[in-house]
Curated annotation (Swiss-Prot):
Keyword Ligase set for record: no
Upper classification of the organism: Bacteria, Pseudomonadati, Pseudomonadota, Gammaproteobacteria, Enterobacterales
Task of the protein: Fimbriae (also called pili), polar filaments radiating from the surface of the bacterium to a length of 0.5-1.5 micrometers and numbering 100-300 per cell, enable bacteria to colonize the epithelium of specific host organs.
Keywords: Fimbrium, Signal
Organism: Escherichia coli
Protein name per Swiss-Prot or TrEMBL: CS6 fimbrial subunit A
Subcellular localization(s) per the UniProt record: Fimbrium
Length: 154
């Protein structure tokens, strides 16, 4: 009978949330909480110019809005990121291609590790310029490549 009564007392104790505090101590907490970063999708606009075969001609532009907390942005071709050169390849005939470079609004060539100084919420445009020397006849068609957009914070 004593065992049953003891069990009933313990359950009654838990049911009423009664507890006895033995001791308390403060412990410092240090943690880093970082904000998730979602890169905005750039808008890529092709050039419909007549002179795309000329050296320095605009092939396409990359427009984007700079996210919060970003101090530098770069856009560079995946094809040869070390030299900042891209290669647009005709989807119908892979032997036809255009070598290009990307520059910022001031004409500075963009590379993987070198970006343009920016401020948050700024609209910025990068230009892909024909890097082929002289003038080359460009066949009409769809030309593909890939570019990377890099965001940097200080």
């Amino acid at each position: 009978m004593k065992k049953t009564i003891g069990l009933i007392l313990i359950l009654a104790s838990f049911g009423s949330h009664a507890r006895t505090e033995i001791a308390t101590k403060n412990f410092p907490v240090s943690t880093t909480i970082s904000k998730s970063f979602f890169a905005p999708e750039p808008r890529i606009q092709p050039s419909f110019g007549e002179n795309v075969g000329k050296e320095g001609a605009l092939l396409f532009s990359v427009n984007l809005t700079v996210p919060e907390n970003v101090s530098q942005v770069t856009v560079y071709p995946v094809y040869d990121e070390d030299y900042g050169l891209g290669r647009l390849v005709n989807t119908a005939d892979a032997s036809q291609s255009i070598i290009y470079q990307i520059v910022d609004e001031k004409g500075k060539k963009m590379l993987k590790d070198h970006g343009a100084e920016v401020t948050p919420n700024q609209q910025i445009t990068f230009k892909a310029l024909n890097y082929t020397s002289g003038e080359k006849k460009i066949s009409p068609g769809i030309y593909n490549d890939q570019v990377m957009v890099g965001y940097y914070v200080n």
